[in-house]
């Protein structure tokens, strides 16, 4: 009899195949319903709950109580350990047997004392393979343990993913049984789903699309789910289709297993350790079953955690790394934020990361890997270069809210001209699942068609871990070379970039920062974290400098290398892109603040020890030692301690990177300089402060009505306007609360107005003049501020204390300037850049809120106004108004973010000429690195001493530290950078006993051709604009 005609109506045929593989419909008779065969419950199930994250050896000793499917456990952040005793039926010999496990929370299976696989419903891992084929002599009974964390892949938000965690959330075990798994059914399901994807993805205008649909339809015709003997016929139809290969010009997709794990975010740091174990042990299991599978893993910190907590797993990771399947990438300690960390902190990310990878895996990383961060500094290309990296992968700019970035593969040129090859996976994700839709998008979305014929495809569940699955691998292997689709190969990042480099002649170049047009609120959210970051960067800088000087001058001093490494790693951990940005839950923020407190406490102890060793043995009176940790001479007013806890103001002079003695506190007398500060309060309540350099006038409510550069009489405040104007905005983003501030918030501006008569004189003049006032921001929030002007100081400081209790409000302070310019300048890592002050294009107005470090400046020819700060990052200049972002009040994922008391200082500096010539850079450093008054040992040094100085103000000596390699060898590393944006030759003056000077890279590897000539304790150095140079100084043996 002739076969019935196939009518092949598109919709009915397509839906017929969909129902044949559906997990929801007709599972009693479709193919999906045959995925598992015979099943039986586990023999014995028992459990115990604990609020602790216990090691396996301790957990298995606890008292397990009977449990059953349907039981609830919790609450959030607790752990439920299950003991699962299994008996496999004799009738299952020759079959593949799985433990099927479905529970809320994230599970980890332990077998014979070692972790073997993660189990997470959200990560599509709900079964563990007990045996591929049950043998006649295989044991029928065994005991497993399943450690279930009471949190999901993405935390435990109450009502939404990014909401604050629900502390009372309960979790449930919904399935625990043994079942026979039909691998042949699984492979047929993979093929049918791929054919459906091709049919839908290529569309009705494509011949190959119909071939895919008709092949799938014919497979349904020949496949009887109840008769497995029909499966090979269907499989042959699929193989014939997928065996039809494409042409040589096909785009090649490099598929790399990936598992992005946020080091902390919607869960605490300690849970990340377990997420790593769950995800990576599953990846290793996949490597054993799929020798061609390659998995990329970043973040040295996470590997260090696993090494400490799971040594057996870590040994296996090293084994698979040797095979080339587990590939460490990134080169950094964590995937840090790309905006807020200082330049030196970014260097340390690579220094700690690359040294870890070299020590643990035998080689450094060749690719920088930062798929998920909130922008990318223009100095990153130079920092990468200095750390041996020329390749960079990320994808976050696909989140841009306004403009689509024009490239996926391109060269990125940094501030100094360094270039790196950059690739954004065109599928706009680092968590692909191997679907045809994603494969087609990777090609269709590629903005460099014709210039680059290779793309990355990162597959695996991510953010909260999870990683790849066997199903994803099966899909990608099936699509390796199929007509109508790009070629897919399982590949490593090194293979991808090598392919891109081999055909890079036509790639375009992007110059400057990679600005993310989203998440602008992260420059301001969680102000206490931002302050801790800035303070701890300073503390570690100062400890390293003083410890280095003590090492050079004292044979007995031991440089605290191990302690400093620990403190640096805490700081680098906090610079993870969801911690320093403030986009984390309350628990993480509190842990971060504890890390900062550890750095402050231990750092100050190390500082005192280094200072004591530095000046030991020099004759002089007891008293105070004033230390200057910056590379230029400073003359400043200091508040020095007196007996009884009081303070006395003194004008001190301290040389560059050195110290000066101060007489004992009892003899301190405030000596008036030739030009003291004058303070005058008018009858209307306004106050004028004048130090002969600048004259400051405040209205009776504390607003700045005039700021004059005395020598020229030039007014800095715009006519008819007032500065130091606090403004409040409504701050309700579209979704990402802690992350985003939207452009429309600018439409809600409300000036905060004070009451006349609240301004009062504080310090009445002489060495210092000040005035202070109170301001009620709202019924719930208030601030107090002291406006301070010191002798000889080119800027006026605003010491501010805020009691902040708001919801979805944004506090800023504005300074309208009598300056006109289309560009404003902002400090970034190791330099500065310009951004527009207008909204001409969409690229301009997308930058309505930007980031800066210690200063920003608005200048016209001959004059400018700089706004400095000691712990803020959010900023903007719109027209002629300089605005500093102070506080936000988001409610997710931390409902308490920014609530409470805050202290910070900002300063305003009018200047003649350019900001470079006026010393704005030095002034901002001085604001952030106050002189140190340390108790001098007895006897104290009698004279001043300077260790280093630089002949050019364009060059900043940023860092002095002991060299990392061979601590026994007395070597220092100095890091300098050109800060003005100029070519410059300069002399570095040394007062230390230096034996040899060699140029080195940022990883402190000497340049074979970099030996420098030391003449008269000076080194000549040559810089190009914004260039960072590192020197290795070998010290002479100290006198005994």
Swiss-Prot record:
Effect on the protein upon substituting residue 871 to S: In CDDG2; uncertain significance; has no effect on processing of free oligosaccharides as shown by complementation assay in MAN2C1-deficient cells
One Pfam family, short name: Glyco_hydro_38N
Keyword terms of this UniProt record: Cobalt, Cytoplasm, Glycosidase, Hydrolase, Metal-binding
Activity control, per UniProt: Strongly inhibited by swainsonine. Also inhibited to a lesser extent by deoxymannojirimycin (DMM).
Active-site residues, record numbering mapped to chain: 372
A GO term from the CC aspect: cytosol
Disease: Congenital disorder of deglycosylation 2: An autosomal recessive disorder characterized by facial dysmorphism, congenital anomalies such as tongue hamartoma, variable degrees of intellectual disability, and brain anomalies including polymicrogyria, interhemispheric cysts, hypothalamic hamartoma, callosal anomalies, and hypoplasia of brainstem and cerebellar vermis.
Xref: PANTHER family: ALPHA-MANNOSIDASE 2C1 (PTHR46017:SF1)
Protein name in UniProt: Alpha-mannosidase 2C1
């Amino acid at each position: 009899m002739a076969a019935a005609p196939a009518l092949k109506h598109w919709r009915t045929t397509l839906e017929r195949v969909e129902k044949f593989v559906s997990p929801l419909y007709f599972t009693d008779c479709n193919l999906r319903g045959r995925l598992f065969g015979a099943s039986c419950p586990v023999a014995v199930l028992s459990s115990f709950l604990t609020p602790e994250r216990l090691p396996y050896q301790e957990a298995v000793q606890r008292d397990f109580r009977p449990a059953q499917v349907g039981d609830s456990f919790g609450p959030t952040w607790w752990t439920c350990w299950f003991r699962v005793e299994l008996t496999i039926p004799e009738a299952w010999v020759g079959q593949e047997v799985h433990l099927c496990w479905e529970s809320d929370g994230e599970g980890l299976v332990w077998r014979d004392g070692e972790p073997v696989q993660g189990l997470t419903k959200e990560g599509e891992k709900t079964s563990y393979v007990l045996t591929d084929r049950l043998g006649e002599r295989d044991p029928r009974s065994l005991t497993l343990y399943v450690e279930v964390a009471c949190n999901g892949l993405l935390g435990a938000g109450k009502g939404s993913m990014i909401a604050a965690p629900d502390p009372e959330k309960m979790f449930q075990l919904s399935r625990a049984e043994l079942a026979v798994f039909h691998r042949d059914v699984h492979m047929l399901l993979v093929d049918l789903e791929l054919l459906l994807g091709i049919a839908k993805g290529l569309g009705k205008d494509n011949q190959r699309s119909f071939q895919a649909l008709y092949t799938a339809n014919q497979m349904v015709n020949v496949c009887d789910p109840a008769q497995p003997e029909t499966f090979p016929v269907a499989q042959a139809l699929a193989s014939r289709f997928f065996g039809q290969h494409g042409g040589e010009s096909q785009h090649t997709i490099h598929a790399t297993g990936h598992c992005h794990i946020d080091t902390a975010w919607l869960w605490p740091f300690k849970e990340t350790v377990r997420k790593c174990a769950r995800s990576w042990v599953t990846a290793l299991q996949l490597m054993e079953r799929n020798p061609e599978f390659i998995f990329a893993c970043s973040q040295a910190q996470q590997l260090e955690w696993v090494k400490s907590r799971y040594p057996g797993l870590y040994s296996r990771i090293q084994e698979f790394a040797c095979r080339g399947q587990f590939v460490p990438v990134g080169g950094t300690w964590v995937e840090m934020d790309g905006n807020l960390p200082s330049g030196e902190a970014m260097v340390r990310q690579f220094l700690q990361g690359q040294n870890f990878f070299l020590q643990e895996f035998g080689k450094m990383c060749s690719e920088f890997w930062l798929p998920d961060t909130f922008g990318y500094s223009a100095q990153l290309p130079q920092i990468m270069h200095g750390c041996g990296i020329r390749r960079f992968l990320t994808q976050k700019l696909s989140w841009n809210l306004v403009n689509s970035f024009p490239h996926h593969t391109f060269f990125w040129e940094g501030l100094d001209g360094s270039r790196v090859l950059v690739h954004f996976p065109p599928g706009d994700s680092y968590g692909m699942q191997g679907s045809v839709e994603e494969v087609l998008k990777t090609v269709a979305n590629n903005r460099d068609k014709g210039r680059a014929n290779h793309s990355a495809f990162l597959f695996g569940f991510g953010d909260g871990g999870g990683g790849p699955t066997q199903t994803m691998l099966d899909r990608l292997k099936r699509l390796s070379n199929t007509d109508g689709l790009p070629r897919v190969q399982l590949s490593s990042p090194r293979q991808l970039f090598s392919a891109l480099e081999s055909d890079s002649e036509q790639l375009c170049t992007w110059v400057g920062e990679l600005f993310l047009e989203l998440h602008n609120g992260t420059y301001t959210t969680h102000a206490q974290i931002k302050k801790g970051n800035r303070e701890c960067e300073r503390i570690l800088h100062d400890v390293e400098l003083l410890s280095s000087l003590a090492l050079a001058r004292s044979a007995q001093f031991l440089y605290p290398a191990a302690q400093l490494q620990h403190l640096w790693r805490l700081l680098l951990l906090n610079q993870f892109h969801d911690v320093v940005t403030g986009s984390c839950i309350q628990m993480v923020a509190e842990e971060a603040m504890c890390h900062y407190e550890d750095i402050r406490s231990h750092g100050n102890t190390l500082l005192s020890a280094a200072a004591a060793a530095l000046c030991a043995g020099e004759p002089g009176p007891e008293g105070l030692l004033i230390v200057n940790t910056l590379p230029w001479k400073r003359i400043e007013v200091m508040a020095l301690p007196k007996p009884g806890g009081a303070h006395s103001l003194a004008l001190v002079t301290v040389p560059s990177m050195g110290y000066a003695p101060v007489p004992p506190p009892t003899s301190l007398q405030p000596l008036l300089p030739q030009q003291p500060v004058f303070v005058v309060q008018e009858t209307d309540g306004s106050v004028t402060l004048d130090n002969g350099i600048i004259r400051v006038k405040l209205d009776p409510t504390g607003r700045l009505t005039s700021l004059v550069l005395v020598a020229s009489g030039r007014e800095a405040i715009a006519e008819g306007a007032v500065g130091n104007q606090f403004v409040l905005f409504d701050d309700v983003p579209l979704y990402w609360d802690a992350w985003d501030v939207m452009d429309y918030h600018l439409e809600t501006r409300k000036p905060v107005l004070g009451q006349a008569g609240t301004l009062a004189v504080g310090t009445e003049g002489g060495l210092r003049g000040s005035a202070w006032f109170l301001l009620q921001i709202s019924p719930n929030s208030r601030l107090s501020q002291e406006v301070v002007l010191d002798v000889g100081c080119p800027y006026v400081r605003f010491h501010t204390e805020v009691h902040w209790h708001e919801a979805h409000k944004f506090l800023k302070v504005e300074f309208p300037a009598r300056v006109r310019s289309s560009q404003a300048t902002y400090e970034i890592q190791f330099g500065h850049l310009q951004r527009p002050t207008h909204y001409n294009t969409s690229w301009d107005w997308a930058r309505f809120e930007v980031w800066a470090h210690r200063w920003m400046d608005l200048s016209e020819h001959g004059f400018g106004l700089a706004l400095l700060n000691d712990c803020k990052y959010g900023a903007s200049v719109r027209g002629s108004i300089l605005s500093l972002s102070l506080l936000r009040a988001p409610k997710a994922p931390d409902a308490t973010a920014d609530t409470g008391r805050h202290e910070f200082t900002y300063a305003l500096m009018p200047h003649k000429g350019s900001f470079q010539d006026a010393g704005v850079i030095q002034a901002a450093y001085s604001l952030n690195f106050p002189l140190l008054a340390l108790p001098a040992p007895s006897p104290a040094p009698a004279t001043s001493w300077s260790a280093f100085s630089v002949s050019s103000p364009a060059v900043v000596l940023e860092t002095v530290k002991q060299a990392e390699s061979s601590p026994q060898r007395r070597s220092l590393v100095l890091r300098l950078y050109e800060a003005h944006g100029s070519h410059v030759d300069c002399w570095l003056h040394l007062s230390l006993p230096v034996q040899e000077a060699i140029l080195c890279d940022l990883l402190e590897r000497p340049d074979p051709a970099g030996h420098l000539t030391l003449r008269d304790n000076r080194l000549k150095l040559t810089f190009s604009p914004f260039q960072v140079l590192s020197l290795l100084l070998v010290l002479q043996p100290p006198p005994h």
